[in-house]
């Protein structure tokens, strides 16, 4: 493997993964709004249409129900479609094909039919309020039959996408809007992206910072936020262990439980809505694994069950960011 | 409205969106902003046919339709600038403007406007009100399934729905010609027993006349109307869009040839309805008023963080 950091944006690592998988397997194709001629609104499919032609890299009309369902049919017909839903917030218009077809057909068919399809979409807060700044990974995770991936680092974006494309199960791959244009060298974690093709197995969390006082489990952009504040917190005497979950389904609660059995404290940071989602699920699984007496303290820091407001002053009050994460850590560490 | 009033209305719309542009580099508008610059003739043209009680449901590119529907300018600008005094107390922002008094709403989700407009149309029909609902869509939004579902229902039940299609020929980078089975959107009307017409949406007089016709059709109980107005989006899809799918030459020519304000000005002068000096003075006054409004709005405070959980449910926080 080459060792110098290539200063790619996350979008470029994504496009690179798709390009390599398209070279490897002629059944891999991409469909979605603006993915062809301009190579995606964030550039995550740039150059692919030139290289692979407009049949395999298709600009679609704004007809998500049709082209998401097409993805299901294409997958059943033997292809490996990557369907881009520009922002995850738009999934409402085609959720039918996602959860009743894509996710259920493998099971309903008694395993006879495979739907090797990827929904690639951008989630997370980008300052554009209630209908354009959600995460929604908890929604997909709640509905059985889909693997759900939300990468944090440049290295993971490439490797997890390759794994998603090769997976014979349907996968929802959720990038973070605020990371897509961020450059590899600005990342505290996983900035090195090898040029060659590689896949990271789905369902394996990664300890991105070792520490002894408190386990902070999170994913997507919040991993960087947590790393950003971890050194300040260390100076204050709180030594964080940070676990990047990488995938929500499968959820690697074993890695988290192992960390908590060492630190005794668990903080789950989730940019998705608080209730009935990832944070509650993960805490429950850790308690199930360690027993009710297995941890000293537990807390969750997530969007407090309101739509994302427009004004920056309100957004900062509800969406986890570096400052609020540090505050949540301090509060949890202060409880003895 | 007189011809001159239509011209003045277009100036107001243009200057409103130019005021919004000022909030982007400063971060006062910290999310996406989609302006209607270049498409003023449509908003200004629909204004005079709307009556009290009518509903307008718009899109992500909604400012001109909101102003046409009578949404007051100051709280609207304040909402776009994320202020506590905004129309939605800073919760909604530019893509989510709601004014119950003027039956105006919108959605940042493409295709999501028409179903809500259909609801208003049904309510007007049920209550025997002589009102209509306007559902706005871009050409891109007309390819969403909701377009078909809504027009089918409105056609079957003869509901007073006007579907206003702003056809600027692009859905971000995707040309309508590549993704529509029909050459025009208006010709789909025959599938729904609807009235349908495509007009030059850069000429405010043509739009005003055509919208009046569409509105008359809908109000007279004969079912839905599709009015497709051709136009040009002068700026990128949103502020920050590189707009690399059009050449510089194309963009320059578009601004030179298809600016609805220039077109109207030329007509007013040619027909002797106004003189150069009068029109210049009108533009200056409009610009000055908008600058004053912007300054007032900018001085307003942001919403207080402590209220971030308010308004989720009636009468309480949670
Ligand atoms: C369901 C849905 N899909 C995609 C988008 C992203 N998007 C926002 S505007 C837009 C293009 C809309 O084109 P058109 O309807 O022609 O309106 P215009 O922007 O040209 O005014 C797209 C793809 C969205 N907001 N909602």
PLM segments and residue spans:
Chain A
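Thiamine diphosphate
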Residues: 1-174, 178-179, 184, 316-317, ...
């Amino acid at each position: 493997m080459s060792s110098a950091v290539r200063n790619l944006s996350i979008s470029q690592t994504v496009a690179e993964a798709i390009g390599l998988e398209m070279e490897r397997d002629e059944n891999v194709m991409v469909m979605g709004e603006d993915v062809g001629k301009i190579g995606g609104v964030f550039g995550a499919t740039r150059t692919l249409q030139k290289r692979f032609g407009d049949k395999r890299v298709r600009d679609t009309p704004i007809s998500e129900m049709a082209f998401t369902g097409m993805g299901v049919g294409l997958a059943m017909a033997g292809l490996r479609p990557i369907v881009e839903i520009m922002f995850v917030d738009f999934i409402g218009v085609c959720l039918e094909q996602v959860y009743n077809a894509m996710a259920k057909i493998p099971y309903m068919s008694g395993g006879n039919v495979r739907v090797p399809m990827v929904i690639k979409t951008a989630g997370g807060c980008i300052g554009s309020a209630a209908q354009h700044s959600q995460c929604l990974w908890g929604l997909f995770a709640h509905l059985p039959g889909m693997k759900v991936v939300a990468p944090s680092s440049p290295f993971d974006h490439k490797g997890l996408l390759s794994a998603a494309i090769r997976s014979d199960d349907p996968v929802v791959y959720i990038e973070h809007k605020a990371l897509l244009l961020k450059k590899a060298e600005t990342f505290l974690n996983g900035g090195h992206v090898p040029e060659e093709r590689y896949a990271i197995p789905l369902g394996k969390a990664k300890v991105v910072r070792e520490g002894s006082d408190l386990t902070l489990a999170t994913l997507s952009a919040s991993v960087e936020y947590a790393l950003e504040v971890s050194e300040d917190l260390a100076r204050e005497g709180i030594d964080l262990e940070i676990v990047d979950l990488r995938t929500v389904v499968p959820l690697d609660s074993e890695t988290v439980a192992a960390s908590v059995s060492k630190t005794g404290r668990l903080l789950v940071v989730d940019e998705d809505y608080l209730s009935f989602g990832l944070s509650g699920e993960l805490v429950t699984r850790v308690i199930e694994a360690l027993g009710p007496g297995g941890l000293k303290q537990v807390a969750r820091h997530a969007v407090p069950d309101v739509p994302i407001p427009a004004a920056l002053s309100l957004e900062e009050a509800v969406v986890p960011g570096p400052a609020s994460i540090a505050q949540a850590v301090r509060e949890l560490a202060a409880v003895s | 409205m007189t011809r001159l009033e239509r011209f003045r209305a277009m100036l107001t719309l243009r200057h409103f969106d130019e005021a919004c542009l000022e909030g982007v580099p400063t971060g006062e508008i910290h999310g996406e902003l989609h302006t209607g610059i270049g498409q003023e003739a449509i908003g200004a043209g629909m204004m005079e046919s709307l009556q009290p009680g009518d509903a307008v449901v718009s899109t992500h590119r909604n400012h001109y339709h909101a102003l046409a529907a009578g949404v007051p300018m100051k709280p609207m600008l304040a909402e776009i600038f994320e202020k506590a005094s905004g129309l939605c107390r800073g919760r909604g922002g530019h893509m989510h403007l709601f004014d119950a008094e003027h039956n105006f709403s919108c959605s940042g989700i493409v295709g999501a406007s028409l179903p809500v407009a259909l609801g208003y149309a049904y309510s007007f029909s049920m209550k025997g009100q002589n009102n209509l609902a306007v559902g706005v869509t871009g050409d891109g939004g007309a390819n969403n399934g909701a377009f078909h579902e809504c027009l089918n229902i409105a056609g079957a039940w003869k509901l007073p729905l006007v579907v206003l299609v702003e056809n600027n020929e692009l859905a971000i980078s995707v040309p309508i010609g590549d993704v529509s089975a029909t050459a025009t959107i208006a010709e789909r009307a025959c599938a729904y027993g609807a009235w349908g017409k495509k007009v030059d949406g850069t000429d405010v007089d043509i739009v005003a006349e055509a919208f009046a016709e569409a509105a008359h059709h809908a109000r007279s109980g004969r079912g839905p109307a599709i009015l497709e107005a051709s136009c040009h989006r002068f700026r990128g899809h949103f502020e920050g869009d590189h707009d690399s799918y059009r050449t510089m030459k194309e963009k320059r020519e578009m601004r030179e040839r298809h600016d609805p304000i220039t077109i109207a000005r030329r007509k007013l002068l040619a027909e002797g309805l106004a003189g150069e000096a009068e029109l210049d003075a009108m533009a200056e006054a409009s610009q000055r008023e908008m600058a004053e409004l912007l300054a007032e709005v900018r001085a307003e405070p942001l919403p207080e963080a402590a209220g971030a959980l308010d308004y989720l449910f009636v009468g309480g926080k949670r």
